Amino acid sequence: MASKNSASLALFFALNILFFTLTVATNCNCKPSPKPKPVPSPKPKPVQCPPPPRPSVPSPNPRPVTPPRTPGSSGNSCPIDALKLGVCANVLSSLLNIQLGQPSSQQCCSLIQGLVDVDAAICLCTALRANVLGINLNVPISLSVLLNVCNRKLPSGFQCA
């Protein structure tokens, strides 16, 4: 039995010496490698604010203000959208006994209500020439009829061109 115990002790010491030798042999006295520094995130570019608006200095030559239209100053264009004048087709149709719906001279006349006679004639002439009304008629006669229905007069010498 003593030989078993001594054999066990000899094996125990042999293994201890082996492990001690291995640990001493692998110790190289090296410093541990330093931890890598984290890569800094890119800094956002500073936002450039637009420069404050400079106070406007009036120019020495201000733009002329267009004077408001007076009853005698007519231009060559209609201040009303010609497509809106399509309601005047019902007025002409009812006068010619063509039933396209309920005739309403009120709608047509209300469109040209605030215009002088020349402007009203220009607007209706534009609508007739563009055939917005959808009826092929003699333009001077149709123009005169539409103006008369709305209690307007065809200006003397006016040519629907």
From Swiss-Prot:
Protein name: pEARLI1-like lipid transfer protein 1
Gene3D superfamilies assigned to the protein according to its UniProt record, in alphabetical order: Plant lipid-transfer and hydrophobic proteins
Protein keywords: Cell junction, Cell wall, Chloroplast, Endoplasmic reticulum, Hypersensitive response, Plant defense, Plastid, Repeat, Secreted, Signal
A- repeat boundaries on the chain: 32-39, 40-47
Compartments where located: Secreted, Cell wall; Endoplasmic reticulum; Cell junction, Plasmodesma; Plastid, Chloroplast
Similarity annotation: Belongs to the plant LTP family. PEARLI1 subfamily.
Signal peptide: 1-25
Residues that span the membrane, as ranges: none
GO biological process: cellular response to cold; cold acclimation; defense response to fungus; induced systemic resistance; plant-type hypersensitive response; systemic acquired resistance
Record note on disruption phenotype: Reduced cutin accumulation due to lower cutin biosynthesis. Early flowering in long-day conditions. Compromised pathogen-induced (e.g. Pseudomonas syringae pv. tomato DC3000 and PmaDG3) glycerol-3-phosphate- (G3P) and azelaic acid-(AA) dependent systemic acquired resistance (SAR). Increased tendencies in cellular damage after freezing treatment.
UniProt-annotated stretches for the region 2 X 8 AA tandem repeats A of P-S-P-K-P-K-P-V: 34-49
Biased composition (Pro residues): 33-70
Gene: AZI1
Residue numbers spanned by region Disordered: 32-76
